[in-house]
Design a protein with these regions (language model features):
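Nucleotide-activated donor-binding/catalytic signature segment of Leloir-type glycosyltransferases, i.e.
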Residues: 258, 262-292
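Conserved donor-binding/catalytic core segment of Leloir-type glycosyltransferases
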Residues: 204-229, 235-240, 250-253
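Short hydrophobic beta-strand element within catalytic cores of glycosyltransferases
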Residues: 330-333, 343
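Acceptor-binding helix/loop patch of EC 2.4 sugar-transfer enzymes
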Residues: 52-62, 111-151, 191-203, 212-213, ...
Length: 411
């Protein structure tokens, strides 16, 4: 099969599948992306460059869409070059979030496009208006509607097909669109992410922070420390945890930028805001902000964790949740739809109200005290991962989906 992948940040969500195709052999794989240092054996890369940023005169709500159209044009130009060199794919696979796929129907008419649909925005549900501490501004509804412009264009493409990794994400799309989107649950490397019974008997050092076997380790991981991922609720739970467990150590992984939602006021960071709010209430000698960590350190942290916190608004679940389950962490997750799709309370973890720090602290303390329950939940999480999140099963399902799509078309 001749594959054309497109993702501005090579290889994006497609790393495992591209490697799998190379190992299968017999495929021709080309990947259009912006320039970066990434490299995968057997993959030819074609680089595109966006000629300019959105105009400052463009309406602020439309700038993201304009940037998507600029990307679409640049990707189409790269695709025309490939076509001129004789390359015509059997299938195009990419992520619809940045608009890159929109013009490829004009370059390769009849070629199926299997696009990754991540999230459809709504003005009255899911993440918008979820947290009363941050009520929607007067202009937010208009901005949210426009954020779906690329989504809607993508859903109208001829020969277009969709994939999405969770039922929750699929449910965000309009009913008329869901029939075009296949549920393809993403897998985890179960060998790389697996429990280590000896981890709690060794010292752990993460970015200079040392955790001994005597410590009760509470962990929290996010790309960035921000409200969308429950950072404020976690921080407000810490005073009680640290007071009632003098052996507790807390490691928080994540940067100080903003991945989702509004930036903090005064150009500060949410970490600074929460530290100021909780000044005098935290034993900061036992609260460790380690920033972003290497993947091996991340895995070591999960293997050692005595209680792992994962909270999110009703939005896209992080990869780290899947990896924590595969590692057999005792997980305390927010009782929000993207998390409850993975975590069954009392079976594969514990669910807590996102907005109730005292309840979060209570359940963390319960798991730190009741190690038998914590072990049972960790085993349940690992069992779920083995049954539902196997990387090999995911790749086999991906193969079947591609086969179904390609069989319906001829480029």
């Amino acid at each position: 099969v001749r594959y054309l992948f497109v993702h501005q940040n090579f290889p994006g969500q497609f790393l495992h599948f591209v490697r799998h195709l190379h190992e299968q052999g017999g495929h021709e794989i080309v990947f259009i992306s912006e320039a970066n240092a990434g490299e995968i054996p057997g993959v030819r890369r074609a680089i595109y460059r966006v000629p300019r940023l959105p105009s400052s005169s463009t309406h602020q709500h439309l700038r993201e869409f304009e940037y998507g159209l600029l990307r679409a044009e640049a990707v189409a130009t790269a695709a025309k070059t490939l076509k001129g060199l004789g390359y015509v794919p059997d299938i195009i696979i990419g992520h619809h979030g940045w608009g890159e796929l929109l013009n490829l129907v004009d370059v390769f008419p009849g070629c199926p496009i299997l696009g990754y649909f991540e999230f459809f925005y709504h003005t009255d549900r899911n993440d918008v208006g979820f947290d009363p501490e941050f009520p929607p501004g007067p202009d937010l509804a208009a901005a949210v509607r426009v954020k779906n412009a690329i989504n809607l264009q993508a859903l109208s493409l001829p020969n277009g097909y969709g994939q999405t990794p969770t039922q929750f994400q699929k449910s965000t799309y309009p009913g008329w669109a869901q029939d075009r989107i296949s549920l393809l649950r993403e897998g985890v490397n179960l060998e790389l992410c697996q429990p280590d019974a000896q981890a709690r008997r060794r010292n752990l050092v993460i970015n200079g922070v040392k955790i001994s076997p005597r410590d009760a380790l509470v962990t929290y991981v996010a790309r960035n420390l921000e409200p969308y991922r429950g950072f404020h609720s976690v921080m407000r739970a810490l005073p009680r945890i640290l007071t009632e467990r003098q052996d507790a150590q807390v490691i928080l992984v994540g940067g100080d930028q903003v991945s989702y939602g509004a930036p903090p006021p005064d150009r500060g960071s949410w970490k600074d805001i929460m530290l100021k709010e909780l000044e005098g209430k935290l034993d900061l000698s036992r609260v460790h902000f380690v920033g972003k960590v290497a993947y091996d350190d991340f895995r070591s942290l999960l293997k050692r964790s005595d209680a792992h916190l994962y909270l999110t608004y009703p939005f896209v679940a992080s990869w780290s949740l899947r990896e924590a389950m595969a590692t057999g962490c005792p997980i305390i997750g927010s009782d929000t739809a993207p998390v409850s799709e993975f975590i069954t309370d009392g079976v594969t973890g514990r669910l807590v109200p996102f907005l109730e720090p005292d309840r979060i602290a209570e359940v963390v303390l319960e798991l730190l005290e009741d190690r038998k329950q914590a072990r049972r939940l960790g085993q349940g999480a690992r069992g779920y991962a083995e049954a539902e999140l196997s990387l090999q099963d995911y790749l086999e399902r991906y193969d079947r989906l591609v086969e179904q799509v390609v069989s319906r078309h001829s480029c």
